[in-house]
Amino acid sequence: MDYTLEATHHKEKLLKTVYALQVKSDTTLQKASPLLSNHHGMGMVTEHQVHQLAEKVKGICHDLDNIKNLLYYRQNNLVQQIPNPNGSSYGGPSGIHCSLDGSIYITSENAPCVHILSCSGQTQQLLPCIEWGRESEAFLPEDVTVTRSGMVAVADMLNRAICVFSHHSRFPKGEWIKIGKVNSPRGIGVDSSGKILVTDYTQGKVHSFALDHAFKILSTHTVSNLCGPRYVSLGPDGGFLVSEECGDVKLFNNQHKLVYSLGSKYGHQFGNPSGVCADIEGNILVADEQHRTVHLFPKSGSPICLVSEGLRKPTGLTCSTSGQLLVADTGDNCIKVFKYRVRPAYSSDAPWVSCDSPNLTPRQRTGSMPL
């Protein structure tokens, strides 16, 4: 059977099914509402029947959410590969952050610098990670983020420091300023209030703090009892997300209280969760280094595997405002960009590259697009 014809039949069947549910529920509501508004009891309807109906409706609603999500999201839709700007002489990219203007910030294993790229992957700026002074010393940033005021902040695990880059310096090219000491800083992010978030890997903690204009730390707070926290990111509804090595991914609210773990809420078994982020719609996305996957955890419905192939060692993870998913693939020494929605959800989105475009070569249709 022709695939297009078969797909049309499936679409018609799905639409008829959903429409039948809508019509039946509307009809039942119209008949039941005036009867239930009179306080004369429930007729012959038993408590058990109400419970059964409630459970069935709950299941149907969950199934409809899953259908909606599966229609809305794509899997393994790789549209671009950005080579590691540090070249093959360094380790693969590990930390990644995408700013509101679409700029991409990248750190790599064993590379003493932060690369700032355009959304197309072209290098815009290079920030060498060097402490200027009598004896200039390079350091290796583990992860990177951008503060609300636009300053680049990194975690320096080797020197147990958090550093912020300041353009207002006595040095013509700016300088890195140490703003705090952490036992083993690994991941770094910014919460909804503008505070910097840092994971303390060996201590099992996440520290949050604000900075004043003189780079003085204010309003410190610590979340403890985590198991090897790796990456941290702004979460949905103003909270934050943190991944635990060989463990789970946990969501905290803006009062630093645990809301839930993804493993418990969704019944999902992680291998080695690494990069985490939330998209503009409030969905949570998690890279799994061991399983070489990326999963999306929707607000309602079951988890969806967005990337199930083509990753060697996914570490850092971020979403762009244009609705693209960027994965730092340390094992493949590049950044991989996926289009995970069926169509742009916002009119302000930048044009997306379509793998179905007739202008693409066969190599590009498979998802590999050299820059």
Regions found by a protein language model. Give the residues of each.
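Protein-protein interaction scaffold domains that mediate dimerization/oligomerization
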Residues: 1-82, 90, 97, 211-212, ...
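A short beta-strand motif characteristic of beta-propeller blades
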Residues: 78-87, 123-135, 171-179, 215-223, ...
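Beta-rich, blade/repeat-based domains predominating
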Residues: 87-99, 133-147, 180-195, 224-239, ...
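Beta-propeller domains
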Residues: 106-130
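Conserved beta-strand positions in repeat-built beta-propeller and related beta-rich domains
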Residues: 106-110, 146-147, 154-158, 196-203, ...
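Structural signal for beta-propeller blades
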Residues: 112-115, 160-162, 204-206, 248-250, ...
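Short loop/turn segments that connect beta-strands within beta-propeller blades
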Residues: 118-122, 166-170, 210-214, 253-257, ...
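Blade-level signature of beta-propeller repeat domains, shared across WD40, Kelch, NHL, RCC1
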Residues: 314-371
